[in-house]
Amino acid sequence: MLKNNPKYYDAHWMPYSGNREFKANPRMIVSAKDTYFTDDKGRKIFDGLSGLWTCGAGHSRPEIIEAVSKQIETLDYSPAFQFGHEKSFELANKIIEFTPKDLDRVFFTCSGSEAVDSSLKIARAYWRHKGKVGKTRLIGRIKGYHGVNFGGISVGGIGPNREMFGQGIEADHLSSTLLPENIFSKGQPKVGDYLADDLLNKILLHGASNIAAVIVEPMAGSAGVFPPPIGYLKRLRKICDSNDILLIFDEVITAFGRMGAKTGGEAFGVTPDIMTFAKQVSNGSQPLGGVVVKKNIYETFMDTKAPNYLVELFHGYTYSAHPVGCAASIASLDILQNDNLIERVKKMSPIFEKELHSLKGLQYVSDIRNYGLAGGITIESAKNEPALRPYQIAMKCWDKGFYVRYGGDTIQLGLPFIVSEQEIKDVVGAISDSIKELQ
């Protein structure tokens, strides 16, 4: 079917998209290299979100292409149930070079959403193995994003992700860390560590003996880039420790460099009991995610009197530890190390912060937040037209040759780790011009 036939676009129900708007005005990407997409009109489009927080090392890296090509010729698929292949063990050992030393057992999934649901199941099953069968309740956070499977939307705190899908799993939510007194903060906000004490209220309400785990993003990304207030995560860690509650960090966005550290936990000086990852692990080139747990959690599952040929965790996916995804991820993590890209994020972050906050004072800009190479710009809503202005800004940026994400009332940036100073200035300039054009 010819692409200029309107029916060409009907068959694909696109995710997280205004399908009606897109199909009336398609924006097609045909190739990508380094920090740029190319659209079907031949225009170069700067990638201001690293794909979807995925491609920090840049697009079409030859090292990853070679690894994927070689792997698919050698072993295109291997069952992960009861059998193994070399690349999965190699990748697991590579991943724990990036995680805090106490996190050293890796369970593979195919996406961040699957990683989150896996982490929740592991947390609940852990307490059953410990004989504390009442510890089933899960605590998330308002404005938290933990993927789109039923576990993730249950602990997540973004209304539109939940309201159409009915009853999820048993969960409660901490207060958001977004406070009006912290507007236009640079890096971590100074006010708000006390918000961790909201967990004490949940403990009073439900009882610590009924709570399995708390799950938070070290830096909330998809809701609009909310770095944690100084001391907040350490306070949350202390409360969890005092009440025998597992702490899960959802690091699908923050792991592997985005914060200028190996993980978000490292950036903020806190080690969780369980950590999820995806996105940057493969540089977006192949679907792969996973969960990393502390050794004592893994050993609790292994400490059984059942015969050793029986399954310890009844969970997994057809494509868990897919050999091609593992090969891509090994190459991706090698690039981060060999090219010193995490150090480069540290170097470029102050430049990004300065340029991003230059937007303060523009009409409609009500807040700006940043950490590492992640930034969020809150735009005042037009009366009775929620999200209209961010959508208009994003489309104007696209027309100028820049891809930025709009979500709710926020323009989001997740710059490539290889971004240049001029590219930072250019993308912020495009946003500035696009905002001014609304006036």
Q: What do the predicted segments below correspond to?
A:
Residues 1-439:
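Conserved N-terminal phosphate-binding loop of PLP-dependent enzymes in the Aspartate aminotransferase
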